[in-house]
Design a protein with these regions (language model features):
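Short glycine- and Lys/Arg-enriched binding-loop motifs that mark or flank ligand-binding interfaces
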Residues: 21, 29, 58
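Short, contiguous acidic and Ser/Thr-rich linear segments
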Residues: 24-34
Length: 163
């Protein structure tokens, strides 16, 4: 697997130590000193997520903790970590990351239909639309809105680590 998007000799990475990781189920490699974001970019991965409301494609635009688009889910099970910022995640052997706010995949997202219906979703529409009947809020409206909100999935099992 070539890394056509990586500079040949410069940078602060250790090219003697290759590190393998998975992103969205596919295996890639990077080097010691890479962040998840830099390794993804080196492997030609530019699409990492979708916007909250309209599910528009999102890629990297920052290089630090201020990155607004590259939020990923790390690992799975009890050790899962939602909303990790890919530009600040150090690449380690066996890292498993997935895109958030997309289904069935980041490249083909059914939620993107919202983009076509944007005339029906003005800013703040949900504050007025889902007011009646009152008892629908917690059982119907809120779960649907939360699922579409683009946040990662919190761990369902207790934390296995001892502190």
């Amino acid at each position: 697997m070539s890394q056509n998007f990586r500079l040949d000799k410069t940078g602060y990475i250790n090219r003697d130590k290759k590190i393998s990781f998975k992103f969205n189920g596919k295996k890639y490699f990077g080097y010691e000193g890479d962040t998840l974001a830099s390794a993804l970019l080196a492997n030609g991965i530019h699409l990492v997520g979708r916007s909250f409301k309209y599910h528009r494609p999102r890629g990297f635009i920052g290089a630090g903790v201020d990155e607004p688009n590259a939020h990923v889910q790390l690992y799975s099970g009890a050790k899962t970590e939602p909303n990790a910022i890919a530009t600040s995640v150090e690449l380690v052997e066996g890292l498993v990351a997935t895109s958030q706010n997309c289904w069935p995949s980041v490249s083909f997202d059914f939620g993107a239909i919202n983009n076509l219906l944007n005339k029906f979703f003005p800013a703040g529409f949900y504050y007025k639309t889902f007011m009646w009947p009152k008892n629908f809020w917690y059982k119907i409206y809120e779960p649907i809105i939360r699922k579409a909100a683009g946040l990662g999935i919190a761990p369902l099992k207790p934390d296995p680590d001892k502190y």
